[in-house]
Amino acid sequence: MSQLTELAKKRLSRSMMFVPGNTPKMINSADIHGADSIMIDIEDSVPVTEKDTARLLTAEALKSRKFRGETVVRINHPTQTPYGYDDLDVIVPAKPDMIRLPKTEDVSEVEIVAKKIEEVEKANGWPEGTINIIVAIESVRGLYNVREICHGPRVVAIALGAEDYRADLRTGKHKPAVELLFARQTILHAAREAGIRVIDTVFSDVKDPQGFREEVEFIKALGY
C-alpha cells in the first residue's frame, strides 16, 4: 500500500459537508463552513434526469477551483446502477481526494473502483494513492462483509448510510437510534482493526442542535 494511502487513513475527519453535484451555487460555497471534507454527491441527491449534468459540473469544479477541505465525490454504484461507470470515467480524472462508494456490499465492488483509479493515476503520472476510497455500508449484506471491505484496496475510511440500512432492516428511525447500535459498533470495530477512519451517519435535522450534540456525545462514547 502506498505512503499516500497510509497518510490518508490518518487524516482528520471531524465533519463532512454534503452538497448536491447538480447545484453549482452550493458547490462553490461548500467551503464557507470550514468542514474537514467536502462531499459532492452525484448519487441520491441528484435526479436521474440530471446525472449527466451533475457529473460534468462536479468534474469542472474539481478541476477549476481549490477547496480547502478534503474533496470527496459520492458516485453512483458501478454494478447496481447504469451510471456508476460513467461517473468513474468523468470524475476520477478530475482528481478528487476520495471516491465514495455507496451501498458497498462486497470487496469485489471496491476492486472495480480501485482498478479505475489505478489506471487514471498511471496514465497521468500521478503518485500511487493520489486518489483513495471511502466505502459506505448501507445494507445487512454489507455489514456482514465489513471486515473484508475495510481491507479492500485504497480503502482509507468507512461510513454508515443509515437510511438505506434502516430500510433493509425493515425498521424506522427512533430516538435514541437503537436500530443503528449493532451497525455502528460493528463498523467501528472493523475500521479500528483495519486501521482506517470511521465516520458516522449523517445527522439531517438542522433544526435540532441539542439532538445533534447528544448524537455526537453518544457516538464519541462508542469510540468514534
Predicted region positions:
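Expand to "…catalyze enediolate/carbanion chemistry for C-C bond making/breaking, isomerization
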Residues: 1-224
